[in-house]
């Protein structure tokens, strides 16, 4: 559960309505894989991830990034039940994929950076603060199965 004020919820949903999920998702996952290269081990089937340009131009990275942000978008519709919303994904990432839950936090922080880059002055400190709460809540929900 994420505790957001009415103003914070409005800020999050207003900005999210302008997000190009495909573009932002691909860039977010791509940046995660470049900045934190150890995360690439979960994506060995994606082909060439040898350079930053290879990662950022990789169609499988872009497609999976879109999928990740589509799930995040679903979470924004259920901020009061993130654990329930992400229960199956938490189980998958814990039991089958064995993803370090810290990676969820890293991904959330990269998403905030990408949103800041895309929205510039519109991504005010207040909007960032609200998004930091949301990505922390999503990361905690995804890590829930690990506890």
UniProtKB/Swiss-Prot annotation:
In the record, Phosphoserine modifications are located at: 45
In this chain, where does the modification N6-acetyllysine occur?
Answer: 60, 83, 145
Tissue specificity, in the record's words, reads: Red blood cells.
Could you tell me one molecular function GO term of this UniProt entry? Answer: metal ion binding
Give the keywords, sorted: Acetylation, Heme, Iron, Metal-binding, Oxygen transport, Phosphoprotein, S-nitrosylation, Transport
Indicate which residues the UniProt annotation says bind heme b: 64, 93
Alphabetized InterPro entries for the sequence: Globin, Globin-like_sf, Globin/Proto, Hemoglobin_b, Hemoglobin_oxygen_transport
**What GO terms describe the biological role, i.e. biological process, of this protein?**
hydrogen peroxide catabolic process
Domain Globin residues, every copy:
3-147
Q: Which residues carry this modification: S-nitrosocysteine?
A: 94
Q: Does the keyword Acetylation apply?
A: yes
Task: List N-acetylvaline occurrences by residue.
Answer: 2
Pfam families this protein is in?
Answer: Globin (PF00042)
Identify the GO cellular component terms for this protein: blood microparticle; haptoglobin-hemoglobin complex; hemoglobin complex
Where are residues bearing Phosphothreonine located in the sequence? 13
- Return the PROSITE patterns for the record: GLOBIN
Q: What are the cysteine partners in each disulfide bond?
A: none
For this chain, the family text in UniProt reads:
Belongs to the globin family.
State what this protein does. Answer: Involved in oxygen transport from the lung to the various peripheral tissues.
**Which proteins does it associate with, and in what oligomeric form?**
Heterotetramer of two alpha chains and two beta chains.
Q: What is this protein called?
A: Hemoglobin subunit beta
Organism of origin is Lepus europaeus
Gene field: HBB
């Amino acid at each position: 559960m994420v505790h957001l004020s009415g103003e914070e919820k409005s800020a999050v949903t207003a900005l999210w309505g302008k997000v190009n999920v495909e573009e932002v998702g691909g860039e977010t996952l791509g940046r995660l894989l470049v900045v934190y290269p150890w995360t690439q081990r979960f994506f060995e089937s994606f082909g060439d991830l040898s350079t930053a340009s290879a990662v950022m131009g990789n169609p499988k990275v872009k497609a999976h990034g879109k999928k990740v942000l589509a799930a995040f978008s679903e979470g924004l519709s259920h901020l009061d039940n993130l654990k329930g919303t992400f229960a199956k994904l938490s189980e998958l990432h814990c039991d089958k994929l064995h993803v370090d839950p810290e990676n969820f936090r890293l991904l959330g922080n990269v998403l905030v950076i990408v949103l800041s880059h895309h929205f510039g002055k519109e991504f005010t400190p207040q909007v960032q603060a609200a998004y930091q709460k949301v990505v922390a809540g999503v990361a905690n929900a995804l890590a829930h199965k690990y506890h």
